[in-house]
Amino acid sequence: MGSRDHLFKVLVVGDAAVGKTSLVQRYSQDSFSKHYKSTVGVDFALKVLQWSDSEMVRLQLWDIAGQERFTSMTRLYYRDASACVIMFDVTNATTFSNSQRWKQDLDSKLTLPSGEPVPCLLLANKSDLSPWAVSRDQIDRFSKENGFTGWTETSVKENKNINEAMRVLVEKMMNNSREDVMSLSTQGNYINLQAKPSSGWTCC
């Protein structure tokens, strides 16, 4: 039998300069640049995964500009997306609080065919920097209160938790595509991506 292809559109949103473009580059090309370049409107990348012996996953990554003036266009950008990543900078409390605005904007404009919200991960980026402007307890509570699938800390620079977090998101999309009602049911928990409980993300 031939390989079965799954195509998913994944949004990457959040305030400007939180690391969205760097995340997309790291995940799709395994590269990182120290030089900041502002996204204008939207940028795109493709990631292909051999999910199993018989299944191929193709991810269209939509890197949405974080500037306020572009938010009127988000309905167009969000259309037909299967999942979302919302990012903030752990050293910048404003980007954290604005994650709620991004989540509300997303939920008001995009749902799954079932009417449920699309899976959405909250990524606490730049975790290699200090001091953090928010605590893990604050993030955990915020994630649960705002209906995120889960959250974890990431460092695009150090390539920490990037592939692991995206794998969790792909698993959620694959489960949704199979209409598996017994699939991942986590709502907002910290997702433990590592063997040690202190450095990952809780799910399930």
Swiss-Prot record:
PROSITE patterns reported in the protein's UniProt record: RAB
GO CC annotation terms, alphabetical: cytoplasm; cytoskeleton; cytosol; Golgi apparatus; Golgi membrane; perinuclear region of cytoplasm; plasma membrane; trans-Golgi network
Q: Which InterPro entries match?
A: P-loop_NTPase, Rab29/Rab38/Rab32, Small_GTP-bd, Small_GTPase
Q: How does it sit in the membrane?
A: Lipid-anchor
Q: For the lipid attachment S-geranylgeranyl cysteine, which residues are annotated?
A: 203-204
Chain positions found as Phosphothreonine: 71
* Chain positions found as Phosphoserine: 72
Phosphoprotein is among the record's keywords? yes
List localization entries: Cell membrane; Cytoplasm; Cytoplasm, Perinuclear region; Golgi apparatus
Matching Pfam families: Ras (PF00071)
The UniProt annotation puts motif Effector region at: 36-44
Origin superkingdom: Eukaryota
Q: Which GO terms describe its molecular function?
A: GTP binding; GTPase activity
- The positions annotated for binding GTP are 33-37, 39, 126, 156-157
Which keywords fit this entry according to its UniProt record?
Answer: Cell membrane, Cytoplasm, Cytoskeleton, Differentiation, Golgi apparatus, GTP-binding, Lipoprotein, Membrane, Nucleotide-binding, Phosphoprotein, Prenylation, Protein transport, Transport
Set out the biological process GO terms recorded for this chain's protein: cell differentiation; cilium assembly; Golgi organization; positive regulation of intracellular protein transport; protein localization to ciliary membrane; protein transport; regulation of retrograde transport, endosome to Golgi; retrograde transport, endosome to Golgi
Give the record's family classification. Answer: Belongs to the small GTPase superfamily. Rab family.
Tell me, in a sentence or two, what this protein's role is: The small GTPases Rab are key regulators in vesicle trafficking. Essential for maintaining the integrity of endosome-trans-Golgi network structure. Together with LRRK2, plays a role in the retrograde trafficking pathway for recycling proteins, such as mannose 6 phosphate receptor (M6PR), between lysosomes and the Golgi apparatus in a retromer-dependent manner. Recruits LRRK2 to the Golgi apparatus and stimulates LRRK2 kinase activity. Stimulates phosphorylation of RAB10 'Thr-73' by LRRK2. Also regulates neuronal process morphology in the intact central nervous system (CNS).
Subunit structure of this chain's protein: Interacts with LRRK2 (via the N-terminus); this interaction is direct and stimulates kinase activity.
Xref: PANTHER family:
RAB FAMILY, RAS-RELATED PROTEIN RAB-7L1-LIKE ISOFORM X1
Kindly provide the name given to this protein in its UniProt entry: Ras-related protein Rab-7L1
Organism of derivation: Mus musculus (Mouse)
Q: Which gene encodes it?
A: Rab29
